[in-house]
Amino acid sequence: MMGMEIRRKHFPDTIRFHNPGLRRHRTSEISCHQIEEFVSISLTGTHCALDCKHCGTNVLRGMNDLSRSSKSLFELCSELAEQGARGILISGGSDRKGKVPILPHLPDLIRIRRELGLIIRVHPGLPDEETSAGLAELDIDGAMVDII
């Protein structure tokens, strides 16, 4: 079976892209949403060990900073859901290996999925096998990757 036939057998013909709300866009293909509906959360605040030129931690500055909060990720998301949020993007700065520290937050993410029903998208950087397995168990709605 050829590659395109395999893809068509297992996936629809549409691709859904996520515009995380850090910049406002409106085109015929992209509709704006209220920023409060889909909230971006940085697990590391503005800290990133890589500080790459394409970002320079600027993207992290527009996110809710979990690292400065006394709340758990679940508590923060509970409040956001009460305020009308329908989904979250979990991101943050990378460590020296390019990994965003999502693994310690997987128990909260599982609770968020089960108890709050929020859409969960992640920007994991370059996740290790354990993080990847946890995200698969969580059944995330999408993953964001850097294309440089």
What positions do the PLM features span?
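N-terminal [4Fe-4S]-dependent radical SAM core
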Residues: 1-49, 53, 57-64
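Core AdoMet radical
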Residues: 57-76, 80-148
